[in-house]
Design a protein with these regions (language model features):
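Acidic, PIN/NYN-like endoribonuclease modules and their adjacent C-terminal/linker elements
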Residues: 117-185
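Active-site-proximal, substrate-binding regions of enzyme catalytic domains
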Residues: 2-107, 118, 166-185
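Acidic beta-strand-to-loop metal/phosphate-binding motif
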Residues: 109-112
Length: 185
């Protein structure tokens, strides 16, 4: 297992993050940051498949081998299956799959559910990153500059209608570099 900036890989990605980057045509940011270590649970893929824009993009990324699809089934560990079934009582199928996989593989979940999922991650020592954390990583790794980060954030808010806790990329930089301002993920 490799790590990027203390986030153990692979990255298990929930639909919110996929939609945020997919709708604005910025899967390239995820690819440059995480290479071929992006896992899309089948339950998440099913949620995304209803989108006429992002559904086909995900299918293409899986066919290319850029993203990997993973199904929780009888071949998985008993613990992973039990966690998944338990989590489905509290979360949707996609988020349950992401949480169960991340917990059992000891890797990172990418989600923007900063309430119940965040609490579950904290309780179970699961590494968590959200859309804003990914944008900051891309900035820090010089994949995007500050102006590009602001433009991507603006597109996510205006096109995707992403309910970001901030609309200013400077706030993102300030939080992740100085831990000042509103807590972001």
């Amino acid at each position: 297992m490799t790590r990027i900036n203390s986030y153990p890989l692979p990255l298990i990605v929930d639909s919110t993050v996929i939609f945020n980057f997919g709708i604005v045509g910025k899967f390239c940011v995820l690819e440059k940051l995480y290479g071929k270590q992006i896992i899309i649970p089948t339950d998440v893929k099913l949620e995304i498949s209803t989108s006429p824009v992002v559904g086909p993009l995900i299918d293409d990324k899986i066919k290319e081998g850029t993203f990997e699809e993973y199904t929780i089934n009888y071949e998985c560990s008993n613990r992973e299956i039990k966690d998944y079934i338990y989590l489905k009582k509290r979360f949707g199928n996609g988020e349950s799959a992401c949480l169960a996989i991340s917990k059992n593989w000891k890797c990172t979940i990418a989600t923007d559910d900063m309430t119940a999922a965040k609490k579950y991650c904290e309780k179970n020592n699961i590494s968590l990153i959200g859309t804003l954390g990914i944008l900051y990583q891309a900035y820090r790794e010089c994949i995007i500059n500050k102006n590009e980060g602001q433009a991507i954030l603006d597109d996510m808010i205006n096109i995707r209608e992403y309910k970001s806790p901030t609309n200013d990329f400077d706030d993102i930089i300030t939080w992740f570099e100085k831990h000042e301002g509103q807590e972001l993920f």
